[in-house]
Regions:
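Soluble accessory domains appended to multi-pass membrane transport proteins
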Residues: 1-100
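Solvent-exposed, non-transmembrane regulatory segments of membrane-associated proteins
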Residues: 71, 75, 79, 85, ...
Length: 164
């Protein structure tokens, strides 16, 4: 039944019930996926056809990345948004793992318990370089936040001891 439907081809990057990797073989009885950890996963086609499949290689090769970054309360929102866009732009100029198909963007999305959260959106050139793109952006965020004095929160716990 899987071969009649063909939801993916060899070489496509897919997620089948949360298992992510590149399809290396589609046979009559099973499908083989090479995971990001370089492990070969064999999945029976009966299991594949009865589960949700996400094909990251269709309809386009690029992959939209959504990343949440938290900053401390009291941070200048305009400065944070500008700095995050500058970080993505700098990473895109210095690495070949990005796509220009969707313009990078930043949104202030949440007042969280200990941070103001922003979502950055950018495109990796393909699923195979998604982590490389995230790494490049994160390194630039750290560099720019340090230069501009923007602080990222970390979990803290205050313990008060009662007097006996």
């Amino acid at each position: 039944m899987l071969n009649a439907d063909m939801p993916f081809n060899e070489g496509d990057w897919v997620s089948i019930s949360g298992n992510y990797g590149q399809v290396v073989h589609v046979g009559i009885r099973s499908t083989r996926i090479m995971t990001g950890d370089n492990q070969l996963m064999t999945i029976p086609n009966a299991s594949v056809s009865s589960n949700i499949i996400i094909n990251y290689s269709k309809p386009t090769e690029y992959m939209v990345v959504h990343e949440t970054i938290g900053v401390t309360y009291g941070s200048d929102i305009a400065l944070v948004k500008r700095s995050l866009l500058d970080a993505v732009d700098s990473a895109m100029q210095n690495a070949s793992c990005f796509s220009n198909d969707v313009a990078p963007d930043v949104f202030f999305v949440e007042f969280a318990d200990s941070s103001m959260n922003f979502e950055i959106i950018f495109c990796a050139a393909s699923p195979s370089v998604k982590k490389r793109a995230i790494d490049a952006v994160n390194c630039e965020i750290d560099r720019i936040f340090t230069e501009r004095g923007i602080e990222m929160p970390f979990p803290q716990m205050v313990v008060t001891l009662a007097k006996q």
